[in-house]
């Protein structure tokens, strides 16, 4: 299913199958663009999931945001790390609340969440368990 279907003003044009797993991973660009009101990007995700549900989708894997402060774009200072990790936590909290609401509203929806935030924190705390050695520095000093 294309994003064009999700953005269509004609929901009947969208067809989804109940047996397909729909993976939803979004929000980082909103935070990169300075969004601090998490209801905006989470609301957009909710609308997209609702459209897919209306079109027939029933199985979803929703991936939360990693701690964006640890990404090369933001790991230059402790202040920036803290700011973007906090924003990621705020987004993830709003996302979890929204997903719980969808589960309550739709008894036939299967919503599973992949907690990437915790996975990244686990890798930073115990890099050897993941076969990693340096989890704090950027791999490249190049500016994109």
Go through each PLM region and give its residues.
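Extended low-complexity acidic/polar segments
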Residues: 38-43, 48-56, 128-144
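Loop/turn elements at helix/coil->beta-strand transitions in domains of secreted/extracellular proteins
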Residues: 17-22, 54-61, 106-112
């Amino acid at each position: 299913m294309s994003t064009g279907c999700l953005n269509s003003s004609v929901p009947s044009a969208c067809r989804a199958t109940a047996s397909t797993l729909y993976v939803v991973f979004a929000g980082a660009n909103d935070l990169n663009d300075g969004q601090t009101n998490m209801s905006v990007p989470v609301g957009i995700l909710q609308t997209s999931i609702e459209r897919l549900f209306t079109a027939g989708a029933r199985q979803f894997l929703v991936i939360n945001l990693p701690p964006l402060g640890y990404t090369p774009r933001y790991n230059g200072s402790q202040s920036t790390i803290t700011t973007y990790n906090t924003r990621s936590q705020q987004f993830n909290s709003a996302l979890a609340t929204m997903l719980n609401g969808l589960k309550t509203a739709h008894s036939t929806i299967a919503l599973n969440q992949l907690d990437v935030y915790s996975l990244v924190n686990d890798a930073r705390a115990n890099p050897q368990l993941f076969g990693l050695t340096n989890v704090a520095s950027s791999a490249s000093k190049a500016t994109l």
